[in-house]
Amino acid sequence: MMRITVLGATGSIGDSTLDVVRRHPDRYRVFALTANTQVDKLAALCRVFRPAMAVVGSATAAEVLRDQLGAEATGIDIRFGPEALEEAAAHPDCDAVMAAIVGAAGLRPTLAAVRAGKRVLLANKEALVMSGALFMDAVRQHGATVLPIDSEHNAIFQCLPQQRPSFGHGVARIVLTASGGPFRTRAVETLAEVTPDQACAHPNWVMGRKISVDSATMMNKGLEVIEAHWLFNVPVERLEVLIHPQSVIHSMVAYDDGSVLAQLGNPDMRTPIAYGLAYPERIEAGVPLLDLAATGTLAFEAPDLHRFPCLALAFDALRAGGTAPAVLNAANEVAVEAFLQRRIRFTEIAAVVGDTLARTAIGPADSLDTVFAADAQARRRAEHYIAASCLQS
């Protein structure tokens, strides 16, 4: 019986994870569930899964959770705050951790799971984007197992030589596919008029609002490129992005002999989640088998960097190295939140990120303190740019 902590249980990845867990009560038991502010939903999940621990973002949220559960709180250790998150991730009674907290907030608890030698199902790409070599060094030092849950990285992992899930061994290049989001064919001159609801209406995937906006700008793919660089030790010049509107091929690995291996499937996060939970076995995930005859045509095109400047910025940050990816991620988080609050236009997201990258000093990412200092500096710089932009508009 595998005991699982779900970091970010109330998000879309949390939903999909718990759906797979529910299908296999003989294999999996929930040890801990965490959420930030969605206390109502967390209370409902606690009633169903009866975790040993539940963690929320604040003392107030913890009191609300206790009140909502009432007598049903018996046997559930309700805690709050960042330290409690790390304890849930590293607890000796937990075997595997689904790392699904969105953004920089997920780095410390994910690292705590790594340092405790857990099986880490990595859905929080920002952890690797920010800390890179520090993260992978911790994986090796503490003997953790990291299984990528992003559909692209999960596909790459499946297509690489087994027992050697890293670059080399005859691999020529790695191709990450991207749907192109909801604005792939929209006139570029109209993108400034895009609303948050339009940006969050992804054509293929059901996701949270932040990652949906990242998909619309293709920053999500840029972050995934950086993640792939660290996960698989791939030089930036061997990483390629290809737009594939149907989201059926989730990524590809090209080999020196001319072979190209691809992983296909319906666009449903339960597939990579089930793979990560059961690896190296396979289990039923509730996802229909792919019907290629019904799918028909599979199309591909190169990304237009004029339409998607955030993708180019991500490649620039990866090439710059050091703290540049952490700066990129922080500026993007601030910009996306400002867009969702209607403080800036959709097209200004890239402007905020580009200005922040250009104006923030980049140094070696040689410690977590350095990474978080760069993150904080970038957030201040991005907020300053947004405030100045709002005054001018």
Curated annotation (Swiss-Prot):
InterPro entries: DXP_reductoisomerase (IPR003821), DXP_reductoisomerase_C (IPR013644), DXP_reductoisomerase_N (IPR013512), DXPR_C (IPR026877), DXPR_C_sf (IPR036169), NAD(P)-bd_dom_sf (IPR036291). It catalyses: 2-C-methyl-D-erythritol 4-phosphate + NADP(+) = 1-deoxy-D-xylulose 5-phosphate + NADPH + H(+). It is an enzyme of class 1 (oxidoreductase). GO terms for biological process: isopentenyl diphosphate biosynthetic process, methylerythritol 4-phosphate pathway involved in terpenoid biosynthetic process. One of its GO terms (molecular function) is manganese ion binding. NADPH binds at residues 10-13, 38, 124, 126, 208. Its EC number is 1.1.1.267. It comes from the Bacteria. The keyword Phosphoprotein does not apply. Keywords: Isoprene biosynthesis, Manganese, Metal-binding, NADP, Oxidoreductase. Mn(2+) binds at residues 150, 152, 224. Pathway: Isoprenoid biosynthesis; isopentenyl diphosphate biosynthesis via DXP pathway; isopentenyl diphosphate from 1-deoxy-D-xylulose 5-phosphate: step 1/6. Its cofactor is Mg(2+); Mn(2+). 1-deoxy-D-xylulose 5-phosphate binds at residues 125, 151-152, 179, 202, 215, 220-221, 224. HAMAP family: DXP_reductoisom. Catalyzes the NADPH-dependent rearrangement and reduction of 1-deoxy-D-xylulose-5-phosphate (DXP) to 2-C-methyl-D-erythritol 4-phosphate (MEP). Belongs to the DXR family. PANTHER family: 1-DEOXY-D-XYLULOSE 5-PHOSPHATE REDUCTOISOMERASE, 1-DEOXY-D-XYLULOSE 5-PHOSPHATE REDUCTOISOMERASE, CHLOROPLASTIC. NCBIfam families: Dxr, PRK05447.1-1, PRK12464.1. This is 1-deoxy-D-xylulose 5-phosphate reductoisomerase.
